Every structure is written in structure tokens, then in C-alpha cells.
């Protein structure tokens, strides 16, 4: 269970009052303290660049007559552990009566497609893995009169070849055309920090038929990990006085979004969430493109802001209570925009590191002010490129130094860039391929029922399809009792997060770890594409490496993994739920039946050329299928271990949580781009201490807490807790935003209470959280490091370089710029 910091509590910590008033048609956010912005009329005039909301359909698709394979493929997916054997996973809204003709009110039909089959509804269910669904929209215009209420574990997918349109009626009532977390009498009905496993992609949200004074929201999206928005268009009225907004997020622990286009509106987006990775968002003609109401850390990559008054407004709370913790903006452009960044930060603002900001490779075109502070212009603009500029605290490597100036940006290895920008690639949807290019694993003999051993059937279909067909994993849970080998040339896509589940004695020997899924064989060259799936284990599998990546892929066309996650325990069928693995804070006895994995993901020394996007490696801290999301104790030895000697690795929007020895470990590797990364220390630590469940194994570069923790701060137990990030003998590890969190000490949350209000304990959950080791480690550089619950923020060869008390933010502690040297 994520720390569910209620928004009112968090903003109380930073003395920022935010009123959220719900009406039948809108949510209006007002802040008691906000730096004055320019008016709508102060947009930089440029009729040549002002884009019409009808001139562009999508950032990544164009109209086509090609049938989308997902619409026409035989749908035989199942929910393996749903007691209703006829439960329907794929739902075409037209099969439920929607017309999509732009005239008929399709609200009831769409909501029925969402809810049919006893699914997990907000307010009546905290979470469920047994009621997954794809709600599919064929091409058309769907008129709705009330909000579509989103259910847990839902993928809302439109036809990418002909984006379907959602439009409100004139009397529309609700918070968002799609409401991702409905409000009730006690606030959000889902705990926003626990809303996992959902997507929205390939839709147009069109508000332009509604008067601009009607402050409708297109999408309400409080959300957590393993969620994504992709390839959507938001059309809003851009007339003077418009009150419309595209996306509203006020809570959660995200998250990823990419390839979104916004036209008009008072706010393109309003963002408030612990952390997020945002890539390739484009804004036209908004008053404010991005309005930050709060965060801990956000990373923006590839923004394009055009003809707006303000690009990013991160001034909420004013100088006495900044509620935006930190923002990193890279490879982005602001064109014909009055102010690119509006901030409340200065040398005396509070909290001291609130409003930390990093700009790297940011281009301005006819944008007069790059950064405006509380009393005026801080950084001028015009038409220029900002190589590196920031504000906050820096350690280079010593500190803290409070800075607000230009700096030398990180040196980017050429292997990671294209035309000097970092390489990116969106999740493939294969929309141009005919249905004949796909092969279903269930049609090929696999069952996916969570009981049958599907190892042989899956290996057979993968081998036969490699380099020829896209392998479609119909929804289901595919039990394997030995390693599943993904061959070179494979393209694999899941349905509603199809699960591969390792089970049995083959994976049970902690002294002889075996991969559940092996991508290629050691030293093999080639490319694999893999998306929309989960890898898990069942029962005690102490020797399981869930994903082992072996492939050598070229930097120019790397292999990719998109929306592929590991989930260890905490779900129906795992035999690692509340009944088997309850918390034991009063006992030091380890339940060996709950030692569930050796490692989540291993990138082997010979591997290279791997692009990860929106990947969450999670050992469950709670039982998703329990009515109360009750906490559990499950043990996994290691998180993500990158040992690639050649490197050329991209980690875009990744998170690793609740492993014993470490979450991220980079050892003897190089040339890694990572941003944003997020971790959580296992809640059960230090009972037992790190390394008790997971003995140190020669050859794995494991940290040895039994020696490294003696004498550290005089508190052995608090030291012997898993590293959030550990770097050993590596170079050019470039981190663009990080949230390394330690919320608990043996399930006691008071250790992470903030310094303020009075009575808070500060960061007292563990002693250290980020370690750099070895004389050969160099250019370990990081923007916007945010930690929670750790006394030391950065440790170099056992010595602390930065303490949290020197870098206090609202709830977290922040260092804007760190260079190891």
C-alpha cells in the first residue's frame, strides 16, 4: 500500500491552502497564494503558428481504412481466478449498444460495457485482479451526458487508425468525460495511491461544443503505478475567458503519460501527484499549458508548448509555502509563449528546496521570459537554447550550495542520443499490420487458466512466430514450470496485462536462481519488442529471476519493453496473499513460504541496447484482492540489477519497490539514461534486517550489510535496510529525476513524518538510501533527487555526502543538482 498522503494534509505541511469545490460539471481549484501570471491577452502574437484544434488529429496516428487488429481478432481471453468462467475481458462498446453516431446518447451503453460482470467499482471495492477489462471504442463520435466512471484494472482503448471522439452533451453533468476516480462523501472513492494497472489510449476528448465559460474537465486521472495515457487529443475552447481543462490530477503515486496533444483551455493540464514521467506532450493556445498544484518530483521530456501565456506554472503556494517540490524539463521547446516557467522560488522562499527546477536542452522561440520568479524575471528568453539552468540546492559533489543560475549540463553519451536529444520510442500498437500478422497463444494451445502447465505450448508458439508474426497473449494467467525463452525477433503484446506466472520447484532453489522469462540467450544479438504484460510467481519460489535480459541490440534500434511489469504476491492465485503472508511486526521469524523471488529483473553483463518505458517491478506490500487492501509480508531478494558492461540502456518512467538488498543496482555498467526513477524500501525492514532473508551470494555484487553497517550512526538496524539505488564501479549513469522513499520501519509509519508540523520525526526510517561505491565510479549525475525517510541522501564509499536536514522540502527532501565528479 502506497503512503496515501491526503492532498489536504500534504498542502497543510507546506502551508498551502487549496480549495477543491465539486459541482455537477466541473472542479475548480483555487490557491490562496499564487504568483501573479500574465493575462490571456498577453500571449505572444503569432497567427502563423496558432494551431486550430481541427488541424491535427493525433501526434502518432492518421485516419486510415485499415481495420485495427485488436478490434477484429478472436477474443477468447479469460480471468483465470475469477469464479465466473464466462467472465468477459474484452468489451466493444458497440456490442453493449453504443452507436457512436454523434447523435445518440451513448452514456448508459458505455457505462454498461465498463461495469458488466460484477467488476471492481469505486466506493464498493478497493481493488481486484480478477475483474480486468478492455473497454474498446471503434471509430465514431460518442455523445455522453454524464461522466463515464472508470473501474479498477481497466484499459480504455480506441482505434488508433481512426481515433474515436468523446463529446459531452450541452447538459453534461460530471467531473470529466472520463472520471478515473470518482468523488464520494469522504473524498476519492479509490485510494489514488493504490490505483494500479490501467490505461487510456487512442481517444479524442472534444469539449469545443460547450460554452467556454463552462469549466468542464476532459479527464479526471488520480492514479498510481503501472498506469499510462498514450496517443490522446484534448480539444478545448480557446476563446477569451475559457475555463475548460484537459486533464486534472490532484492525488496519487504515478505514473506515465506520452504522446498527448492539447488545444485551447484555461489549463491544458492541472497536475498534483507524488511523481510522474511525462513524454511528448504538445500544447496549443492554452492560457496555462501545465498548472502544477503540488508534486514531489516530475520529469518532462519532449514538451512542445505553443502560443500559451504560461508554459509551466509551478508557483502554487507562493514564497511561504511552495507545494511543487521539483521539476525537471529536458529536450523541450517553448514557442510564442509569454513565460516558459513561472515559479515562487527564491533565496528565502519556504520550504528551502521547494520549487527546485532543472532545465536541460530547452529551446525558446519568440518566448520573452524563460523563468519568472516571485518578483520578476529571473532568466530572460527570446529565441535561444538553454543548455543547463537550475534553482535549488546543488552538490558537485560537496554542498549544499543554494543556486539559481546556468550550469554545465550533463555530458550525453552519443550512444543514447539522436540529433543530440535522448532516444525515445513510443509503445508499438502495430496498427498498420493486418490481422493475419498475429498469432494467439490460446489458439496455439496454451490455456492461460493458472492451473495448466503452459510452458511447452508457449515456448512452441514463440519459436514458430519469431521474426514472422506478432504473438498475442490473450488475457489469462499462463503458468510455467521452467524458463520461458523469448527468441530473437519476437514481437509480443498482451491483453489486459496477461500474466506469465512461474511456479514449482524449478524456481525454488535460492542457491541456483533460474529465470522465469529469458529474453534471448547469453551473448545473442537481435531485437525483441514486448508490451502490456505482467510476470509473476506463485508460492515459495526463492530462486526465481522474473525477467532476465540477455540480448545484444544496436543502440540505433534497441529492443524495447513497454508497460511490462513484475508483480510478486498480493494477487489472486499467487498463494502469496493475506492468508499465507500476513505482516509479523512482533515476530522475527521469517515465513520461508513467503520468500517469493531471487530478483525481479537482471540485465546480464553481455546485454546492451534496451529501452524500458513505464516498467514497474513490484513486490506486493498489500493484497490487492483483499477488501481492505491489507498489508502483507513478502520477501524478494533483489530488484533491478543492471550489469551490462556496454550499457546503452534507457529507463523511462520506471519504478522498483520492496526488495530486500536493493531496488536499483548498477554494477560495472555505463551509459544509462534513467528518468524518472522511483523506489520504496520494504515495509517490513529492519525486521529482519536486509541480508537475513537474502544471503550475500558471490558473483552478484550483493551489498554486505553485516560489514558495511557496523558503526554507522550507531544504529545497525536502521542502516541494514535495502538501498533505493546502488552504483558500483560504473560511469555515465545519468538520472533525470528520482524519488527514493522509505516510509516505514517495521510497519511503523511515524519514522517518515515530516519535520513540520510540530511533532514530526523527520527522516528516521533508515540511515542511508543511495550509495556510490568504487574509485572507478564516475559521472554518476542526478537531477532532482528526492528522498523520504532517510537520514543520508547520498553516500560515497560509506561516507555521507548529503543529509536530509540540509535539504528540507515539503514532505520529501530535495537536491536539484548532483554531480559525483
Identify what each model region corresponds to:
Residues 2-134, 147, 152, 159-210, ...:
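Extracellular "leader-to-stem" segments immediately downstream of a signal peptide or signal-anchor
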Residues 137-141, 153, 161, 475-476, ...:
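Tight coil/turn sites that cap or link beta-strands
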Residues 143-145, 478-482, 487, 673, ...:
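Flexible loop/turn segments at secondary-structure boundaries
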Residues 146, 153-154, 264-267, 274-290, ...:
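Internal alpha-helical scaffold/solenoid segments in large eukaryotic proteins
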Residues 242-243, 626-627, 631-641, 651:
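Active-site-adjacent structural elements in folded domains
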Residues 449-464, 477-487, 491-495:
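Glycine-rich phosphate/ribose-binding loops and adjacent secondary-structure elements
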Residues 460, 464-465, 470-479, 483, ...:
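C-terminal, well-structured subdomains that either form a transmembrane helix-short loop-helix hairpin
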Residues 729, 736-739, 752-753, 757-761, ...:
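Long, ordered, helix-rich scaffold segments
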